Structures are given as structure tokens and as C-alpha cells.
Amino acid sequence: MATHQVDAVVLVGGKGTRLRPLTLSAPKPMLPTAGLPFLTHLLSRIAAAGIEHVILGTSYKPAVFEAEFGDGSALGLQIEYVTEEHPLGTGGGIANVAGKLRNDTAMVFNGDVLSGADLAQLLDFHRSNRADVTLQLVRVGDPRAFGCVPTDEEDRVVAFLEKTEDPPTDQINAGCYVFERNVIDRIPQGREVSVEREVFPALLADGDCKIYGYVDASYWRDMGTPEDFVRGSADLVRGIAPSPALRGHRGEQLVHDGAAVSPGALLIGGTVVGRGAEIGPGTRLDGAVIFDGVRVEAGCVIERSIIGFGARIGPRALIRDGVIGDGADIGARCELLSGARVWPGVFLPDGGIRYSSDV
């Protein structure tokens, strides 16, 4: 199967509530990840696989996507947009774009997954098995937090299981699928439908659909939480996660054009510094994601945290495992630890939040 005869469908309609306050101003797939909108990494992988036609299924802040990617020509793609008037779920989102499909086969992606899967190999697997649906599956250390997808010795899916304390397999749904058009046409239109909880179990129960699982051992991460977002960004910077959108040397830091890093600042752990950001002397950034226009003043320590657009971090502040919203102003010597989230534009005075008594 030639990849140019395949459509790509990317579902990007979610509100990204677990990443608030960052997603109050931008959809999750548009947040800077290793200095680029996250979706750029996925679209670059799609283009590198030879797929040309992409449909973005949008809902939350849809105009942001078209403003960034336009017709897709800058990435070597042809991008079209379909907006949901109300949330339709994963299955409903697929059905909603059916009118834009040009081919009999479509590869569908959840737009918040960072993956290194070989897309051409996945399509070859689908074709060689003459499958109606193929799911990319990954193995995880603790599958109890996920729904499981067991397969038989011929790689055919035998069940779709909800979260359980005693899962029979470590294989989980990786959020990437290959559909034949005749299956997409069976998905109900105009209402919310879950592909995981409704479409796939119904197809399996009917018994007339060949559903296969492609077990993949490449890099995979769901970017839905601050912890995973930070880790995924750092893995891109360090070259652990692949992306055709990132060129050049990978290492402990990625400093984008227009950023200013003072002598004596230490940037490690896959830290990324956005355009126009200023990093003061004596600072220590370890696994930090610094968006464009941020000012980090002297002596700050920022670890495994995300600092939103245009925020200011005052001298000797400590931020660990936190999320700072766009335009927030964190005063000198503040300490924000373990899950702290500061909303956009909030001002914290010098020493306003401390976890220790020394000042």
C-alpha cells in the first residue's frame, strides 16, 4: 500500500484540562514542546512517512490550528480542517471527518501522543493481514491505569478491557489506528461516540470485522499531564524521542533563537528555552520547559516545570514540578513545589509562598 494513498486524520478537539492553566490560551496540541507546537512533531512524522493528505478534527479554539499550519504546504502536506460544533468523542470525531476522506484507508491519530512508531511499517502490517482495523499497541510496566487490548497468536484482537486491578496483558491502546473506509462508514454520526468503549467492542461482537493489534516497542508517551509533558519535551531535546521537525545536535539543552542565557546559568536535563526568553546568572534549570518571552532572574532554580508565555520568575525563586501560567509574576524567594499551578497574570509578592522558614 503506497502511503500517498492513505489519509491521515488527527483528532485535536480536546480541551486539555489536565494541563491547565496553559491550555486556557491554547489547545494542548499547540503548546510549545521542544520549542515547537506539539502537533508539528506529529505532522512532520506523517509527512516523513509519505502521507500527503491530513484532516484535523478540531473543536476547542479551532482557529489556532489553521493560523499556524494553513494549507500544510510548509510541511509538505495538504491539510484540511473539520470543526465539531459540540464534543463528539474519538469515534464521533472520526465519523465527522468522513466527508473529507479521499482514500479507502485512513490512519487516525490522537493528537496528544508522542510516538516513534514506524508508520510505513504499521501500514504494511495492516495490508499484509488484510485487516479492517489495526490498532497500534504498546506494552507498559503497569497496565492497571489503562484499558488493555489482548491479542491471540495471530495478532488478532480478542477483547477490549476496561481498567482492572488484574489485567491479563500489558498491551494497551497507543492512540493510533488504521481504518478501512467501510468501517468508518459504520460509526454513528452526529452524536458523541467513543471508539474505545463503543465502536471497537461492537465490531468485535459482530464478528465480521478483522481487527488486528500491531505491538510496537518504539518510544511512546501520552502528553496529557504536566509530568508527561515535561518528560516528553526533555526526551525530544535529548534525542530519546524522535522527531523529523528537530534538526541538528541533541543534548542537555535547547536554546532557541533570540533567547539570552547569562554566563553562569546551568541548563541540564533536556531544558528548552523559548524565543526571546531571558535567563539570569546563577540560575539552575533542570528539565524545565521555558516558553517564549519568559524572564528568569538571578539565582532561580526551576526543575521539571513549565513556565508559560511572558511570565517572570523573581530572583532566588524555587519552582519544582510546577506549572506557571502565561504572564504570571512570581516574586523573589517564592517556593512553589509538587503540583503547584499559578493561573495566568497572577502576581505573587516577594516571599509570598514559602515551604521553609528561612528568608
Curated annotation (Swiss-Prot):
Alphabetical list of InterPro entries matching this protein: Mannose-1P_guanyltransferase, NTP_transferase_dom, Nucleotide-diphossugar_trans
Cellular compartments per GO CC: cytoplasm
Enzyme superclass (EC): transferase
Gene3D superfamilies: Hexapeptide repeat proteins, Spore Coat Polysaccharide Biosynthesis Protein SpsA, Chain A
Miscellaneous field: Could be the potential target for novel anti-tuberculosis drug.
Role played: Catalyzes the formation of GDP-mannose from D-mannose-1-phosphate and GTP. Plays an important role in the synthesis of different glycoconjugates which are responsible for cell wall structure, virulence and immunomodulatory activity of M.tuberculosis.
Top-level lineage group: Bacteria
pH relationship of activity: Optimum pH is 7.5.
Pathway: Cell wall biogenesis; Nucleotide-sugar biosynthesis; GDP-alpha-D-mannose biosynthesis; GDP-alpha-D-mannose from alpha-D-mannose 1-phosphate (GTP route): step 1/1
Protein name (Swiss-Prot/TrEMBL): Mannose-1-phosphate guanylyltransferase
Molecular function GO labels: GTP binding; nucleotidyltransferase activity
Temperature dependence as stated in the record: Optimum temperature is 37 degrees Celsius.
Keyword annotations from UniProtKB, A to Z: Cell wall biogenesis/degradation, GTP-binding, Nucleotide-binding, Nucleotidyltransferase, Transferase
Changes seen on gene knockout: Essential for in vitro growth. Knockdown of the gene decreases the cell growth and alters the integrity of cell wall and cell membrane.
